[in-house]
Every structure is written in structure tokens, then in C-alpha cells.
Amino acid sequence: MTIMITTGNSFEGKVIKQYLGIVRGIVVRSPTISQGLMGGLKSIVGGKIGAYSQMCEHAREEAFQLMIEHAQALNANGIIAMRYDTGEIGQAGTEVLCYGTAVII
């Protein structure tokens, strides 16, 4: 089933028939030893930390997919007000949360 997703509060030209509640996907990731070493070196000399960027992008995509699976479990065909949030888990990890409101349109 295809789910329409928007960061807005509605879908243009569509009527929301039912609000099903909040759906979310949460992923916690920590860098590998090699990513940590490379990140540490990059932080000293400056520049983009590619390994960390890639890790964060994969975590965002995984959290997004988990949110979609949560919505599908509720038989939703739309998600409105989709957002990302991140936080640190100690010094070892990063949490990525993707959330929104599941709806039937």
C-alpha cells in the first residue's frame, strides 16, 4: 500500500476522513571504531565528516521506514506533519526519531 506523506497538516485536494494518532520510527546508532577514528581526525583538521554523515543519513532512512511500517500497521494511507528529531545518547550514540500523524484520506 502506498502512503502519502507530507510535512504539512493536510493534503491539497484531499479530505482527511480519520486521524489515527501518532506514528514513529526510532533508531539509535553509534559509529564503528574506524568511523570514530576518522571522525576524530577530521574534527582536529576540520572538514566534512563523511562517515558520520553517511551514518546519520542511514539512520534517518531507517527511522522513516519504521514510521511507515507503524502507519501501515494502523491501516493508514497518509501521514501528515512528518518531522525528524535527533538527540545524543551519552557520548556513544545518536538517536533519530521520525514521527507524524497517521490518517485515512
From Swiss-Prot:
Natural source organism: Legionella pneumophila (strain Lens)
Gene3D superfamilies recorded: Hypothetical protein apc22750. Chain B
Name of the molecule in the record: UPF0145 protein lpl0253
Protein family: Belongs to the UPF0145 family.
Taxon lineage: Bacteria, Pseudomonadati, Pseudomonadota, Gammaproteobacteria, Legionellales
